[in-house]
């Protein structure tokens, strides 16, 4: 099975690119982030015409996640249990959607940005990751879950775990994505029983997944590695390869992120 994750940065602007990507890569399951539309605005028909089922979670032009699958799409959950609320009038944001696809419990995740260190959104980000980690640990724990469960937590994590996951650490001084609390919250998923398999298969430094649109960041390869896949032991054992589809940052109207693809043995 081929499982991909992609922050598409507006699915309505990039539906043709997304469908073309599915077709030319033979991807079976695609987790999307930053779809930026309500559920009823999502271009479902384009994916159905290509042979895929779709589950979406979106309220507005902000955030939004989806899962596209041609190997089943069962037991859809919008938001994870204990997902924290945010806002002046606290509400659930469209940042997590789960579904069982081909026997794997796939979660498409769009982790909060954090905005700036000390901002309420930064605290929300840390709480969001901490709560997700607790849930994910329970899914694998004997008694509350199944240690042999097939679970994949994929998406835009908005954390650069290593200094070499950004092109110039000095640029990020006092900024989000690289602070010790964020990195610790990200690393805690290892202690919950998960393996970040993109690093296992692509250990090289400066293998970025995101380049800002401004200041010629992509031509200069001034990027960030912030799109990852934490998977359960059962899925880690099946993962034979990972690719970062850098060419998707080229061409007309690309997203600022590129797909990350996992190959899972049958």
Language model features with spans:
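Active-site-proximal beta-strand elements of phosphoester/diester hydrolases
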Residues: 1-10, 103-118, 257
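N-terminal, active-site-proximal structural segment of metallo-dependent hydrolase catalytic domains
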Residues: 1-56, 62-65, 161
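Catalytic metal-binding/acid-base residues of hydrolase active sites
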Residues: 9, 36, 81, 112, ...
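Structured beta-strand-rich core segments of catalytic domains in phosphoester-bond hydrolases
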Residues: 35-38, 42-116
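Metal-dependent phosphoesterases centered on the DNase I-like endonuclease/exonuclease/phosphatase
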Residues: 50, 128-226
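Conserved beta strand-loop-helix elements of the APE1-like EEP
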Residues: 61-76, 205, 217-238, 264
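Surface-exposed cleft-lining segments at the edges of enzyme active sites
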Residues: 80-87, 111-130, 170-174
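Surface polyanion/phosphate-binding segment centered on an Asp-His-Pro turn
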Residues: 243-266
């Amino acid at each position: 099975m081929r499982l991909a994750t992609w922050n598409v940065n507006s699915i309505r602007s990039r539906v043709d690119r997304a469908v073309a990507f599915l077709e030319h890569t033979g991807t079976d399951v695609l987790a999307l982030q930053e779809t930026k539309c309500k559920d009823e605005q999502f271009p479902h028909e384009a994916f159905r015409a290509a042979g895929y089922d779709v589950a979406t979670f979106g309220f507005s032009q902000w955030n939004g996640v989806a899962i596209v699958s041609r190997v089943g799409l069962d037991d859809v959950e919008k938001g994870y249990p204990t997902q924290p609320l945010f806002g002046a009038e606290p509400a659930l944001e469209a940042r997590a959607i789960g579904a069982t696809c081909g026997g794997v419990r796939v979660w498409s995740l769009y982790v909060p940005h954090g905005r700036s260190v000390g901002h309420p959104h930064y605290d929300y980000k840390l709480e969001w990751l901490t709560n997700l980690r607790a849930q994910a640990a329970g899914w694998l724990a004997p008694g509350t879950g199944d240690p042999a469960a097939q679970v994949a937590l994929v998406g835009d994590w908005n954390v650069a775990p290593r200094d070499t996951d950004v092109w110039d650490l000095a640029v990020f001084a006092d900024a989000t994505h690289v602070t010790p609390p964020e990195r610790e919250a990200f690393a805690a998923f290892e202690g919950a029983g998960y393996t970040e398999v993109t690093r296992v298969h692509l250990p090289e430094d400066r293998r970025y997944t995101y380049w800002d649109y401004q200041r010629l960041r992509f031509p200069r390869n001034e990027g960030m590695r912030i799109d990852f896949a934490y998977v359960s032991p059962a899925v880690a054992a099946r993962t034979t390869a990972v690719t970062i589809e850098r060419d998707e940052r080229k061409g007309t109207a690309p997203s600022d992120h590129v797909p990350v693809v996992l190959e899972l043995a049958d």
